């Protein structure tokens, strides 16, 4: 988990997530650095929009409350269902990417 936390810390500080930066954060925290994990983390996060991933990770709580809201017209329901299906597909893709990260850290 320390590796992911290091990446999140770098991201929140506005720093680039590179092998050297991740190593520096881990070393500053007193963690024994595993070069393979650092390389795998940086490679896995390449092209990932971290802000979007964080936002979507927090989304299921908000989505669960949505069905309790007012009833929608049938046409609106069809649009919402299509939108929800698209969102679910995106979530599945992100979950697969996150699972790939989980495999790296055992």
UniProtKB/Swiss-Prot annotation:
GO molecular function, one term: structural constituent of ribosome
Acidic residues biased stretches: 83-98
GO cellular component: ribonucleoprotein complex; ribosome
GO biological process terms held by the UniProt record: translational elongation
Domain of life: Archaea
Keyword Manganese: no
Chain positions covered by the region annotation Disordered: 69-106
Keyword annotations from UniProtKB, A to Z: Ribonucleoprotein, Ribosomal protein
HAMAP family, per the entry: Ribosomal_L12_arch
Quaternary structure and partners: Part of the 50S ribosomal subunit. Homodimer, it forms part of the ribosomal stalk which helps the ribosome interact with GTP-bound translation factors. Forms a heptameric uL10/P0(P1)2(P1)2(P1)2 complex, where uL10/P0 forms an elongated spine to which the P1 dimers bind in a sequential fashion.
General function of this protein: Forms part of the ribosomal stalk, playing a central role in the interaction of the ribosome with GTP-bound translation factors.
UniProt family annotation: Belongs to the eukaryotic ribosomal protein P1/P2 family.
Designated name of the protein: Large ribosomal subunit protein P1
């Amino acid at each position: 988990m320390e590796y992911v936390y290091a990446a999140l810390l770098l991201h929140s500080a506005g720093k680039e997530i590179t092998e050297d930066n991740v190593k520096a954060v881990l070393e500053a925290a007193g963690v024994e650095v595993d070069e393979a994990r650092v390389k795998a983390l940086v490679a896995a996060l390449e092209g990932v929009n971290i802000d979007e991933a964080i936002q979507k990770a927090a989304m299921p709580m908000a989505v669960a409350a949505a069905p309790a809201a007012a009833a929608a017209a049938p046409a609106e329901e069809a649009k919402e269902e299509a939108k929800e299906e698209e969102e679910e597909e995106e979530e599945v893709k992100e979950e697969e990417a996150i699972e790939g990260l989980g495999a790296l850290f055992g």
